[in-house]
Swiss-Prot record:
Expression sites by tissue: Highly expressed in the tapetum and developing pollen of the anther locules. Weakly expressed in root and germinating seed, hardly in the anther-less-flower and not detected in leaf.
Keyword flag Ribosomal protein: no
GO molecular function terms listed in the Swiss-Prot or TrEMBL record: cysteine-type endopeptidase activity
Family statement: Belongs to the peptidase C1 family.
Protein's name in the database: Cysteine protease 1
Length: 490
Protein backbone atom coordinates (compact mmCIF):
# COMPACT_ATOMS: atom_id res chain seq x y z
CA UNK A 1 0.00 0.00 0.00
CA UNK A 2 1.17 3.49 -0.70
CA UNK A 3 1.70 5.81 2.25
CA UNK A 4 -0.87 8.51 2.87
CA UNK A 5 0.05 11.31 5.24
CA UNK A 6 1.61 9.46 8.18
CA UNK A 7 4.82 7.61 8.80
CA UNK A 8 4.94 3.99 7.76
CA UNK A 9 4.01 1.36 10.30
CA UNK A 10 7.14 -0.05 11.90
CA UNK A 11 5.89 -3.63 11.67
CA UNK A 12 3.08 -4.96 9.49
CA UNK A 13 1.14 -7.95 10.56
CA UNK A 14 1.43 -11.45 9.17
CA UNK A 15 -1.09 -13.27 11.29
CA UNK A 16 -0.34 -16.91 11.85
CA UNK A 17 -3.01 -16.41 14.57
CA UNK A 18 -4.41 -18.81 17.06
CA UNK A 19 -4.93 -22.21 15.40
CA UNK A 20 -7.73 -23.49 17.55
CA UNK A 21 -7.05 -27.18 17.14
CA UNK A 22 -8.90 -27.86 20.36
CA UNK A 23 -12.17 -26.62 18.91
CA UNK A 24 -12.49 -29.75 16.82
CA UNK A 25 -12.64 -31.89 19.95
CA UNK A 26 -15.46 -30.17 21.82
CA UNK A 27 -18.08 -32.74 22.91
CA UNK A 28 -21.84 -32.30 22.68
CA UNK A 29 -23.25 -29.92 25.27
CA UNK A 30 -24.84 -32.77 27.20
CA UNK A 31 -21.42 -34.27 27.92
CA UNK A 32 -20.49 -31.48 30.37
CA UNK A 33 -22.00 -31.59 33.87
CA UNK A 34 -24.25 -28.59 34.50
CA UNK A 35 -22.15 -27.35 37.43
CA UNK A 36 -18.77 -27.57 35.69
CA UNK A 37 -18.07 -23.85 35.82
CA UNK A 38 -18.70 -23.71 39.57
CA UNK A 39 -15.75 -26.06 39.96
CA UNK A 40 -13.27 -24.85 37.38
CA UNK A 41 -13.78 -21.15 38.00
CA UNK A 42 -12.55 -19.42 41.14
CA UNK A 43 -14.16 -20.65 44.34
CA UNK A 44 -14.18 -18.26 47.31
CA UNK A 45 -12.98 -21.09 49.54
CA UNK A 46 -9.63 -21.07 47.72
CA UNK A 47 -7.26 -18.17 47.37
CA UNK A 48 -8.88 -15.61 49.64
CA UNK A 49 -7.85 -17.53 52.75
CA UNK A 50 -4.54 -18.60 51.28
CA UNK A 51 -5.72 -22.14 50.65
CA UNK A 52 -4.72 -24.16 47.62
CA UNK A 53 -6.77 -26.89 46.05
CA UNK A 54 -5.65 -30.35 46.96
CA UNK A 55 -4.41 -32.62 44.21
CA UNK A 56 -7.65 -34.60 44.46
CA UNK A 57 -9.67 -31.40 43.95
CA UNK A 58 -7.48 -30.40 41.02
CA UNK A 59 -7.88 -33.83 39.41
CA UNK A 60 -11.65 -33.64 39.83
CA UNK A 61 -11.61 -30.23 38.14
CA UNK A 62 -9.39 -31.61 35.35
CA UNK A 63 -11.77 -34.52 34.72
CA UNK A 64 -14.66 -32.08 34.39
CA UNK A 65 -12.57 -29.86 32.13
CA UNK A 66 -11.69 -32.85 29.93
CA UNK A 67 -15.35 -33.80 29.67
CA UNK A 68 -16.08 -30.33 28.35
CA UNK A 69 -13.05 -29.71 26.15
CA UNK A 70 -11.71 -33.12 25.12
CA UNK A 71 -13.63 -36.00 23.65
CA UNK A 72 -12.97 -39.15 25.64
CA UNK A 73 -12.87 -37.62 29.14
CA UNK A 74 -10.36 -38.36 31.86
CA UNK A 75 -8.52 -41.18 30.13
CA UNK A 76 -7.50 -39.13 27.12
CA UNK A 77 -4.45 -37.05 26.36
CA UNK A 78 -3.71 -34.29 23.91
CA UNK A 79 -1.31 -36.25 21.73
CA UNK A 80 -1.87 -39.82 22.83
CA UNK A 81 1.70 -40.29 24.14
CA UNK A 82 2.34 -42.33 27.26
CA UNK A 83 2.59 -39.96 30.19
CA UNK A 84 1.14 -37.02 28.27
CA UNK A 85 -2.12 -37.13 30.20
CA UNK A 86 -0.24 -36.69 33.48
CA UNK A 87 1.92 -33.93 32.03
CA UNK A 88 -1.17 -32.10 30.80
CA UNK A 89 -2.74 -32.42 34.23
CA UNK A 90 0.32 -30.82 35.84
CA UNK A 91 0.13 -27.91 33.40
CA UNK A 92 -3.60 -27.61 34.04
CA UNK A 93 -3.03 -27.58 37.81
CA UNK A 94 -0.40 -24.85 37.48
CA UNK A 95 -2.80 -22.75 35.41
CA UNK A 96 -5.56 -23.45 37.93
CA UNK A 97 -3.37 -22.05 40.72
CA UNK A 98 -2.64 -19.01 38.55
CA UNK A 99 -6.36 -18.48 37.88
CA UNK A 100 -7.31 -18.95 41.54
CA UNK A 101 -4.68 -16.46 42.71
CA UNK A 102 -5.61 -13.90 40.06
CA UNK A 103 -9.33 -14.14 40.73
CA UNK A 104 -8.77 -13.84 44.48
CA UNK A 105 -7.01 -10.51 43.88
CA UNK A 106 -9.73 -9.48 41.42
CA UNK A 107 -12.40 -10.10 44.05
CA UNK A 108 -10.55 -7.99 46.61
CA UNK A 109 -9.64 -5.08 44.32
CA UNK A 110 -12.06 -5.40 41.44
CA UNK A 111 -10.91 -6.29 37.96
CA UNK A 112 -11.11 -8.77 35.13
CA UNK A 113 -11.36 -12.49 35.78
CA UNK A 114 -9.66 -15.53 34.33
CA UNK A 115 -11.13 -18.96 33.60
CA UNK A 116 -10.04 -22.48 32.72
CA UNK A 117 -10.91 -22.25 29.03
CA UNK A 118 -9.83 -24.53 26.20
CA UNK A 119 -6.21 -23.35 26.51
CA UNK A 120 -5.96 -24.36 30.17
CA UNK A 121 -3.71 -27.39 29.64
CA UNK A 122 -1.07 -25.40 27.74
CA UNK A 123 1.85 -23.53 29.23
CA UNK A 124 2.04 -19.97 28.00
CA UNK A 125 5.23 -20.86 26.16
CA UNK A 126 3.46 -23.70 24.35
CA UNK A 127 0.54 -21.40 23.65
CA UNK A 128 2.75 -18.73 22.11
CA UNK A 129 4.98 -21.14 20.20
CA UNK A 130 2.08 -23.13 18.79
CA UNK A 131 -0.56 -20.51 18.08
CA UNK A 132 1.11 -17.13 17.62
CA UNK A 133 2.70 -15.70 14.51
CA UNK A 134 5.58 -13.40 13.68
CA UNK A 135 5.87 -9.76 12.71
CA UNK A 136 7.55 -9.12 9.34
CA UNK A 137 9.02 -5.90 8.02
CA UNK A 138 6.57 -3.06 7.64
CA UNK A 139 5.39 -1.18 4.58
CA UNK A 140 3.42 1.94 3.70
CA UNK A 141 -0.17 2.38 4.88
CA UNK A 142 -3.19 3.98 3.24
CA UNK A 143 -4.02 6.38 6.06
CA UNK A 144 -7.41 8.05 5.69
CA UNK A 145 -8.41 11.45 7.02
CA UNK A 146 -12.13 10.70 7.50
CA UNK A 147 -11.69 9.49 11.07
CA UNK A 148 -8.72 11.58 12.13
CA UNK A 149 -9.79 13.12 15.43
CA UNK A 150 -9.22 16.85 15.61
CA UNK A 151 -10.01 17.17 19.31
CA UNK A 152 -13.11 19.26 18.64
CA UNK A 153 -16.02 17.03 17.65
CA UNK A 154 -18.01 15.27 20.32
CA UNK A 155 -18.15 11.49 20.18
CA UNK A 156 -20.83 9.27 21.71
CA UNK A 157 -20.06 8.09 25.24
CA UNK A 158 -20.62 4.50 24.16
CA UNK A 159 -21.19 2.51 20.98
CA UNK A 160 -22.04 -1.17 20.53
CA UNK A 161 -22.64 -2.38 16.98
CA UNK A 162 -24.08 -5.62 18.37
CA UNK A 163 -27.07 -3.64 19.64
CA UNK A 164 -27.54 -2.23 16.13
CA UNK A 165 -27.53 -5.65 14.48
CA UNK A 166 -24.30 -5.03 12.58
CA UNK A 167 -22.46 -8.17 13.68
CA UNK A 168 -23.15 -11.79 12.80
CA UNK A 169 -23.98 -13.99 15.81
CA UNK A 170 -22.74 -16.20 17.28
CA UNK A 171 -19.03 -15.42 17.15
CA UNK A 172 -17.35 -17.56 14.49
CA UNK A 173 -14.50 -19.98 15.15
CA UNK A 174 -11.40 -20.03 12.96
CA UNK A 175 -10.54 -23.55 14.15
CA UNK A 176 -7.17 -25.07 13.31
CA UNK A 177 -6.20 -22.48 10.72
CA UNK A 178 -4.23 -19.23 11.04
CA UNK A 179 -6.99 -17.23 9.40
CA UNK A 180 -7.75 -14.58 12.04
CA UNK A 181 -6.95 -11.92 9.40
CA UNK A 182 -9.79 -13.25 7.22
CA UNK A 183 -12.28 -13.36 10.11
CA UNK A 184 -11.35 -9.82 11.12
CA UNK A 185 -11.77 -8.44 7.60
CA UNK A 186 -15.02 -10.31 6.96
CA UNK A 187 -16.58 -9.09 10.22
CA UNK A 188 -15.73 -5.49 9.33
CA UNK A 189 -17.25 -5.90 5.84
CA UNK A 190 -20.36 -7.56 7.28
CA UNK A 191 -20.74 -4.56 9.59
CA UNK A 192 -20.40 -1.81 6.98
CA UNK A 193 -22.71 -3.71 4.64
CA UNK A 194 -25.41 -3.76 7.33
CA UNK A 195 -24.92 -0.05 7.99
CA UNK A 196 -25.15 0.95 4.31
CA UNK A 197 -27.73 -1.52 2.95
CA UNK A 198 -29.66 -2.60 6.03
CA UNK A 199 -28.86 -6.26 5.34
CA UNK A 200 -26.76 -8.47 7.60
CA UNK A 201 -25.15 -11.16 5.45
CA UNK A 202 -22.70 -13.75 6.77
CA UNK A 203 -19.78 -13.73 4.33
CA UNK A 204 -17.15 -16.27 3.36
CA UNK A 205 -13.85 -16.36 5.21
CA UNK A 206 -12.95 -19.43 3.17
CA UNK A 207 -12.95 -17.40 -0.05
CA UNK A 208 -10.27 -15.16 1.45
CA UNK A 209 -8.28 -18.14 2.74
CA UNK A 210 -8.24 -19.85 -0.66
CA UNK A 211 -8.41 -16.99 -3.15
CA UNK A 212 -6.87 -13.87 -1.53
CA UNK A 213 -3.20 -14.76 -2.00
CA UNK A 214 -2.20 -11.15 -2.67
CA UNK A 215 0.30 -9.15 -0.63
CA UNK A 216 1.19 -10.85 2.66
CA UNK A 217 -1.84 -13.13 2.74
CA UNK A 218 -1.07 -16.83 2.84
CA UNK A 219 -4.26 -18.64 3.80
CA UNK A 220 -3.93 -20.65 7.01
CA UNK A 221 -0.34 -19.44 7.37
CA UNK A 222 -1.41 -15.87 8.09
CA UNK A 223 -2.17 -12.56 6.45
CA UNK A 224 -3.20 -8.97 7.08
CA UNK A 225 -6.59 -7.31 6.93
CA UNK A 226 -5.57 -4.54 4.50
CA UNK A 227 -4.66 -7.12 1.86
CA UNK A 228 -7.99 -8.88 2.47
CA UNK A 229 -9.88 -5.61 1.90
CA UNK A 230 -7.82 -4.98 -1.25
CA UNK A 231 -8.77 -8.40 -2.62
CA UNK A 232 -12.49 -7.90 -1.93
CA UNK A 233 -12.49 -4.48 -3.61
CA UNK A 234 -10.53 -5.69 -6.63
CA UNK A 235 -12.62 -8.85 -6.97
CA UNK A 236 -15.83 -6.82 -6.97
CA UNK A 237 -17.22 -8.48 -3.85
CA UNK A 238 -17.33 -11.55 -1.64
CA UNK A 239 -19.50 -14.67 -1.62
CA UNK A 240 -21.67 -15.78 1.30
CA UNK A 241 -20.56 -18.17 4.02
CA UNK A 242 -23.47 -20.45 3.13
CA UNK A 243 -22.36 -20.81 -0.49
CA UNK A 244 -18.60 -20.92 0.20
CA UNK A 245 -18.45 -22.50 3.69
CA UNK A 246 -15.48 -22.47 6.03
CA UNK A 247 -13.30 -25.60 6.22
CA UNK A 248 -10.44 -24.40 8.48
CA UNK A 249 -7.86 -25.52 5.92
CA UNK A 250 -6.17 -24.30 2.77
CA UNK A 251 -7.60 -25.37 -0.57
CA UNK A 252 -7.82 -24.48 -4.23
CA UNK A 253 -9.74 -21.30 -5.01
CA UNK A 254 -13.23 -22.08 -6.30
CA UNK A 255 -13.41 -19.71 -9.26
CA UNK A 256 -17.14 -20.21 -9.78
CA UNK A 257 -17.88 -19.21 -6.18
CA UNK A 258 -15.33 -16.40 -6.30
CA UNK A 259 -17.37 -14.89 -9.15
CA UNK A 260 -20.52 -14.80 -6.99
CA UNK A 261 -20.08 -11.28 -5.63
CA UNK A 262 -22.83 -10.86 -3.06
CA UNK A 263 -21.41 -8.00 -0.94
CA UNK A 264 -18.96 -5.44 -2.31
CA UNK A 265 -16.82 -2.63 -0.93
CA UNK A 266 -15.30 0.38 -2.66
CA UNK A 267 -11.94 0.22 -0.94
CA UNK A 268 -10.39 0.62 2.49
CA UNK A 269 -8.42 3.07 4.62
CA UNK A 270 -6.21 2.90 7.69
CA UNK A 271 -6.97 4.73 10.92
CA UNK A 272 -4.19 7.18 11.88
CA UNK A 273 -1.83 5.07 13.94
CA UNK A 274 -1.16 5.38 17.67
CA UNK A 275 -4.23 7.54 18.22
CA UNK A 276 -7.02 6.07 20.35
CA UNK A 277 -9.27 9.08 19.75
CA UNK A 278 -9.09 8.53 16.00
CA UNK A 279 -9.84 4.86 16.56
CA UNK A 280 -12.77 5.83 18.76
CA UNK A 281 -14.11 8.10 16.02
CA UNK A 282 -13.81 5.28 13.49
CA UNK A 283 -15.54 2.74 15.74
CA UNK A 284 -18.34 5.26 16.35
CA UNK A 285 -19.10 4.98 12.62
CA UNK A 286 -18.47 1.28 11.89
CA UNK A 287 -16.76 -1.90 13.13
CA UNK A 288 -12.99 -1.63 12.62
CA UNK A 289 -10.36 -4.32 12.05
CA UNK A 290 -7.52 -4.09 14.57
CA UNK A 291 -4.34 -6.03 15.31
CA UNK A 292 -3.27 -6.84 18.87
CA UNK A 293 -0.67 -8.67 20.91
CA UNK A 294 -2.63 -11.65 22.23
CA UNK A 295 0.23 -13.74 23.63
CA UNK A 296 0.11 -13.09 27.38
CA UNK A 297 -0.89 -15.73 29.92
CA UNK A 298 -3.72 -13.55 31.18
CA UNK A 299 -5.02 -13.07 27.65
CA UNK A 300 -4.74 -16.82 27.09
CA UNK A 301 -7.01 -17.53 30.08
CA UNK A 302 -9.28 -14.42 29.88
CA UNK A 303 -12.84 -14.96 31.04
CA UNK A 304 -14.63 -11.68 31.76
CA UNK A 305 -14.31 -8.03 32.76
CA UNK A 306 -12.24 -5.15 31.40
CA UNK A 307 -8.87 -6.61 30.45
CA UNK A 308 -6.02 -4.66 32.05
CA UNK A 309 -3.48 -7.47 32.02
CA UNK A 310 0.10 -7.54 30.80
CA UNK A 311 0.69 -7.43 27.04
CA UNK A 312 3.07 -5.82 24.59
CA UNK A 313 2.91 -4.57 21.01
CA UNK A 314 4.02 -7.68 19.11
CA UNK A 315 1.00 -7.69 16.81
CA UNK A 316 0.12 -11.33 16.24
CA UNK A 317 -3.67 -11.57 16.09
CA UNK A 318 -6.43 -9.94 14.03
CA UNK A 319 -9.74 -9.04 15.70
CA UNK A 320 -12.54 -6.45 15.31
CA UNK A 321 -13.41 -3.47 17.50
CA UNK A 322 -17.22 -3.37 17.50
CA UNK A 323 -17.77 -0.77 20.19
CA UNK A 324 -16.53 1.05 23.26
CA UNK A 325 -17.90 2.20 26.59
CA UNK A 326 -17.30 2.53 30.33
CA UNK A 327 -17.81 -0.23 32.89
CA UNK A 328 -20.57 0.78 35.29
CA UNK A 329 -19.04 -1.03 38.27
CA UNK A 330 -15.41 0.06 37.97
CA UNK A 331 -15.57 3.17 35.79
CA UNK A 332 -12.96 1.64 33.45
CA UNK A 333 -13.10 2.74 29.81
CA UNK A 334 -12.95 -0.19 27.39
CA UNK A 335 -13.03 -1.37 23.78
CA UNK A 336 -15.48 -4.14 22.87
CA UNK A 337 -13.48 -6.55 20.72
CA UNK A 338 -14.85 -9.49 18.74
CA UNK A 339 -12.53 -12.50 18.59
CA UNK A 340 -12.66 -15.53 16.28
CA UNK A 341 -12.30 -18.36 18.81
CA UNK A 342 -15.98 -19.22 19.07
CA UNK A 343 -18.59 -18.12 21.61
CA UNK A 344 -17.18 -20.13 24.54
CA UNK A 345 -14.06 -17.96 24.98
CA UNK A 346 -14.23 -14.78 27.05
CA UNK A 347 -17.55 -12.95 27.18
CA UNK A 348 -19.46 -14.99 24.59
CA UNK A 349 -16.53 -14.70 22.20
CA UNK A 350 -15.72 -11.05 23.01
CA UNK A 351 -13.17 -9.32 25.20
CA UNK A 352 -13.41 -5.86 26.73
CA UNK A 353 -9.97 -4.27 26.55
CA UNK A 354 -8.80 -1.25 28.52
CA UNK A 355 -9.19 2.06 26.62
CA UNK A 356 -7.47 5.45 26.94
CA UNK A 357 -4.23 4.03 28.31
CA UNK A 358 -1.04 6.04 28.74
CA UNK A 359 0.78 4.37 25.85
CA UNK A 360 -0.06 5.91 22.48
CA UNK A 361 -0.15 2.43 20.95
CA UNK A 362 -3.23 1.54 23.00
CA UNK A 363 -3.74 -1.59 25.05
CA UNK A 364 -1.88 -4.51 23.46
CA UNK A 365 -1.15 -2.30 20.43
CA UNK A 366 -4.81 -1.93 19.47
CA UNK A 367 -4.26 1.57 18.02
CA UNK A 368 -1.21 0.66 15.93
CA UNK A 369 -2.73 -1.00 12.88
CA UNK A 370 -6.46 -0.38 12.59
CA UNK A 371 -8.26 -0.29 9.24
CA UNK A 372 -11.79 -0.27 7.88
CA UNK A 373 -13.59 -1.01 4.60
CA UNK A 374 -15.26 1.77 2.61
CA UNK A 375 -18.72 1.20 1.13
CA UNK A 376 -20.85 3.88 -0.49
CA UNK A 377 -23.36 2.14 -2.71
CA UNK A 378 -25.48 -0.96 -3.23
CA UNK A 379 -24.18 -4.46 -3.73
CA UNK A 380 -23.81 -6.04 -7.18
CA UNK A 381 -26.93 -7.48 -8.74
CA UNK A 382 -27.16 -11.25 -8.42
CA UNK A 383 -25.27 -13.06 -11.14
CA UNK A 384 -27.45 -14.91 -13.65
CA UNK A 385 -27.56 -18.65 -13.10
CA UNK A 386 -24.93 -20.65 -14.91
CA UNK A 387 -26.16 -22.22 -18.16
CA UNK A 388 -27.16 -25.84 -17.93
CA UNK A 389 -24.39 -28.19 -19.02
CA UNK A 390 -24.58 -29.47 -22.57
CA UNK A 391 -25.82 -33.03 -22.92
CA UNK A 392 -23.45 -35.80 -24.02
CA UNK A 393 -22.99 -36.33 -27.76
CA UNK A 394 -24.77 -39.49 -28.89
CA UNK A 395 -22.63 -41.14 -31.56
CA UNK A 396 -25.01 -43.99 -32.31
CA UNK A 397 -27.39 -46.21 -30.44
CA UNK A 398 -24.57 -47.76 -28.42
CA UNK A 399 -21.90 -45.06 -27.99
CA UNK A 400 -21.67 -41.46 -26.79
CA UNK A 401 -19.07 -38.77 -26.14
CA UNK A 402 -19.00 -36.19 -23.31
CA UNK A 403 -20.46 -32.71 -23.72
CA UNK A 404 -18.12 -30.33 -25.56
CA UNK A 405 -16.61 -33.06 -27.74
CA UNK A 406 -17.27 -34.43 -31.25
CA UNK A 407 -18.02 -38.01 -32.26
CA UNK A 408 -15.52 -39.27 -34.86
CA UNK A 409 -15.34 -42.79 -36.25
CA UNK A 410 -12.17 -44.68 -35.30
CA UNK A 411 -12.96 -47.84 -37.22
CA UNK A 412 -15.74 -48.68 -39.63
CA UNK A 413 -16.82 -51.02 -42.39
CA UNK A 414 -18.15 -49.25 -45.46
CA UNK A 415 -20.70 -46.77 -44.09
CA UNK A 416 -21.08 -48.38 -40.70
CA UNK A 417 -18.90 -47.24 -37.76
CA UNK A 418 -17.84 -50.01 -35.43
CA UNK A 419 -15.69 -48.02 -32.97
CA UNK A 420 -16.27 -44.36 -32.14
CA UNK A 421 -13.74 -41.87 -30.81
CA UNK A 422 -14.23 -38.52 -29.05
CA UNK A 423 -12.47 -35.43 -30.39
CA UNK A 424 -11.75 -33.12 -27.41
CA UNK A 425 -13.33 -30.06 -29.11
CA UNK A 426 -16.92 -29.34 -30.09
CA UNK A 427 -17.92 -29.09 -33.77
CA UNK A 428 -14.61 -30.54 -34.95
CA UNK A 429 -13.63 -31.97 -38.34
CA UNK A 430 -12.78 -35.67 -38.17
CA UNK A 431 -9.61 -36.48 -40.10
CA UNK A 432 -9.47 -39.34 -42.60
CA UNK A 433 -6.87 -41.22 -40.58
CA UNK A 434 -9.68 -41.99 -38.10
CA UNK A 435 -7.44 -41.07 -35.17
CA UNK A 436 -7.13 -37.27 -35.21
CA UNK A 437 -9.40 -34.23 -35.57
CA UNK A 438 -9.25 -30.48 -36.25
CA UNK A 439 -11.14 -27.62 -34.56
CA UNK A 440 -13.92 -25.91 -36.48
CA UNK A 441 -11.82 -22.76 -36.89
CA UNK A 442 -9.24 -24.84 -38.81
CA UNK A 443 -11.44 -27.34 -40.65
CA UNK A 444 -9.02 -28.51 -43.36
CA UNK A 445 -7.28 -31.65 -42.10
CA UNK A 446 -4.13 -33.04 -43.73
CA UNK A 447 -3.72 -36.34 -41.92
CA UNK A 448 -0.49 -37.21 -43.71
CA UNK A 449 1.18 -33.90 -42.86
CA UNK A 450 -0.62 -33.81 -39.51
CA UNK A 451 -1.86 -30.24 -39.94
CA UNK A 452 -5.10 -28.29 -39.54
CA UNK A 453 -5.57 -25.11 -41.59
CA UNK A 454 -8.25 -22.55 -42.37
CA UNK A 455 -8.23 -23.30 -46.10
CA UNK A 456 -6.77 -25.90 -48.40
CA UNK A 457 -3.88 -23.81 -49.70
CA UNK A 458 -3.28 -21.58 -46.68
CA UNK A 459 0.29 -21.77 -45.34
CA UNK A 460 -0.64 -19.69 -42.29
CA UNK A 461 -2.36 -20.38 -38.99
CA UNK A 462 -1.62 -24.07 -39.11
CA UNK A 463 -2.44 -26.25 -36.12
CA UNK A 464 -1.58 -29.81 -35.17
CA UNK A 465 -4.57 -32.18 -35.06
CA UNK A 466 -5.71 -33.58 -31.74
CA UNK A 467 -5.79 -37.27 -31.03
CA UNK A 468 -9.13 -38.83 -30.20
CA UNK A 469 -10.13 -40.88 -27.20
CA UNK A 470 -12.42 -43.89 -27.22
CA UNK A 471 -16.13 -43.17 -26.83
CA UNK A 472 -18.27 -44.27 -23.91
CA UNK A 473 -20.37 -47.33 -24.68
CA UNK A 474 -23.89 -47.58 -23.37
CA UNK A 475 -22.67 -50.77 -21.66
CA UNK A 476 -20.10 -49.17 -19.33
CA UNK A 477 -18.40 -52.46 -18.45
CA UNK A 478 -17.11 -53.08 -21.96
CA UNK A 479 -14.85 -50.05 -22.76
CA UNK A 480 -13.54 -47.06 -20.80
CA UNK A 481 -12.06 -43.84 -22.14
CA UNK A 482 -10.25 -40.63 -21.23
CA UNK A 483 -10.71 -37.47 -23.30
CA UNK A 484 -7.36 -35.93 -24.19
CA UNK A 485 -6.56 -32.33 -23.28
CA UNK A 486 -7.12 -29.45 -25.66
CA UNK A 487 -3.39 -28.79 -25.45
CA UNK A 488 -3.02 -31.38 -28.21
CA UNK A 489 -4.20 -28.58 -30.53
CA UNK A 490 -1.07 -26.41 -30.72
Amino acid sequence: MAGGGGKSVAAALAMACFLLILAAFAPPAAAAPPDIMSIIRYNAEHGVRGLERTEAEARAAYDLWLARHRRGGGGGSRNGFIGEHERRFRVFWDNLKFVDAHNARADERGGFRLGMNRFADLTNGEFRATYLGTTPAGRGRRVGEAYRHDGVEALPDSVDWRDKGAVVAPVKNQGQCGSCWAFSAVAAVEGINKIVTGELVSLSEQELVECARNGQNSGCNGGIMDDAFAFIARNGGLDTEEDYPYTAMDGKCNLAKRSRKVVSIDGFEDVPENDELSLQKAVAHQPVSVAIDAGGREFQLYDSGVFTGRCGTNLDHGVVAVGYGTDAATGAAYWTVRNSWGPDWGENGYIRMERNVTARTGKCGIAMMASYPIKKGPNPKPSPPSPAPSPPQQCDRYSKCPAGTTCCCNYGIRNHCIVWGCCPVEGATCCKDHSTCCPKEYPVCNAKARTCSKSKNSPYNIRTPAAMARSVPEQPDSISFVVLNREDLV
